[in-house]
Structure formats: structure tokens, C-alpha cells
Amino acid sequence: MNTLDETLLKEIISSNKKYTNYGQVASYIPELKNARRNDLGICIIDSENNLYSAGNCSTKFTIQSISKPIVLAMALMDNDWEDVFSNVGMEPSGDPFNSIMKLEINDTKKPCNPMINAGAIVTTSLINGSCLEEKEERMLSFFRKLAKNDNIGINYDVYKSEKMTGDRNRAMAYLLKSDGFIRGNVEDVLDLYFKQCSIEIDSVDLARIGINLANYGVDIENGEHLMSEMVSRIVKTFMMTCGMYDASGEFAIKVGIPAKSGVGGGIMASVPGRMGIGVYGPALDKKGNSVAGVKVLEELSNKLKLNIF
């Protein structure tokens, strides 16, 4: 087995850089098409709080769907978990992340899981707060605490772009509201959802969040309980079964690490008890996952024996 160090990470980045040519940056949200297609970076923070990085690890990008497990954690902390899962399911969908189809054909009508757009809109509606502003501040505060970065904020150019082009998400939200799964005002829920997807981070932030999840919800630096062990376990389970869109099964076989991707090009991975990983590569495959990022994680998992199965 190889030893984790920056030399290894630089080798892995170098050997997988060619895969950045095999994908395309997201363009359906206009602001995302400004990303540099050939960027590729990684950061790892291990259980001893050692940080290793290589490539474009400090490049800023928006979190997009990687926000979903974090907002799920908030929903589980704010509500009884049976209440959460009476509104959103626990099963992989096998459909694209923005599909509406199963909201109509499923017997329950509720979203299959919290890692697809419909499910994440539901969990966003379950965040406590007396008004939209309080919910937004609580959400940002939680992201900042998990990442140990008080400078994390919303990229308002991306937020406006998301809001302007978010008709499909609007359709989902109003359908879910009509079936009783959305709590509160639909437009307020959507506004918070678009803002959470527009939070700007880098690979170091993702690695820090990943290690705190890997450490069962306990801050690796100061021992603070950021979430319960049960919540961290539920979140990592969804990352494993549903975190890579409709390529989650293939990723589980080839990589075997709980992970969540986003169309901004990021992937956050959490190896229980061992490390948190943040990867950035904005060239995406047809399912919305970073082409080179997945390859980087596959090689890393094989070389460090990270597969949890």
C-alpha cells in the first residue's frame, strides 16, 4: 500500500489530468460555463488533522449538489428523523438528479431520496427559522463551522443565474407543495435552495467538511460535536448509495467511498475514521460528475486501500 503524502497526490493529479479533456463544464446554469475545463485539484485532511494537497486545490467554485448532505444533516438535527423521512424517501432513484418523473408515478409521491433535487428541496423546507433570513444565516453558519472557514459565503452571480434558469426546480417544488411535502412558502424555500447551491468553497473546505463527517460528526480539531453520530452515519449512507447521481452504484464498486458530487465540478468524499477528501475538476460527464475527479478518487482508493467494502 502507498503512503499518503503530497508526492503521491501530485502523481495522481498528473496521471489523471488527461481526463479533463473528456468532459464539458456545466452550461445550463450560465455562470458555471465560465469554469476552466482543465482545472484539477485535490485536498485531503486525515484523522490526525494533517493536510495534503495538489493541483488546483485553492480554486473557488460553487458547492451545488454537495450542499445536499449538509442540508440533510440540518434537517435531521432540526426535526425528528421519522418526520424527515415521512417527506422524503431513502432509496436510490436510478434517474437523473433533476428528474420529475417519479414524483408522479411513485405510490407515495414523495422524492426517492435527499440527494436528488426534489428531495433536497424538501429537506431545505425542513430547516428551522422564523424567517427566510434566519434560515439563511443558520445554514451559512453551519457550513462555516463544518469547514472551519468564516469567509464562506454565497456567490450572488451564480445565485441569480440559478434563480433565473430554475424553472424545472420550481415545477418540482410546486408539485411537492401540492402533495403536502413542502413546509412553508414555496418561493422562500426555492430562494434558500438556490442560495445553498451557490455557496462558494474550495477543495480544502470540502476536505474539512469530509473529515468532520468521517470523524462521526466530531470536530477533528477541538472535539466539538457538530452533529450526532447517528446523523453523520445517515448522511454518509446517503452519500454512498445516492451521492454520485445515477452513477452511484458504479462508483461504489470502483471506488467504494461515501461521496457527493456537484455540477460545479466538486466532489466531497468521507472515509469513515480515516480522512476527508475534496476534489475539483469542472469537466463533467453526462451524469453530472467530474470525469477526472472520479478517476482521481478511483486511483487514490486503490493505492491507499480506502474502499470500505
Swiss-Prot record:
Record field: catalytic activity: L-glutamine + H2O = L-glutamate + NH4(+)
The entry's keywords: Hydrolase
EC number in record: 3.5.1.2
SUPFAM superfamilies, alphabetized: beta-lactamase/transpeptidase-like
Annotated substrate binding sites: 65, 117, 162, 169, 193, 245, 263
Group of enzyme by EC: hydrolase
MF-aspect GO terms: glutaminase activity
GO biological process per UniProt: glutamate biosynthetic process; glutamine catabolic process
UniProt cross-references to Gene3D superfamilies, sorted A to Z: DD-peptidase/beta-lactamase superfamily
Transferase in keyword set: no
Record's subunit section: Homotetramer.
Family stated for the protein in its record: Belongs to the glutaminase family.
Protein's recorded name: Glutaminase
Source species of the chain: Clostridioides difficile (strain 630) (Peptoclostridium difficile)
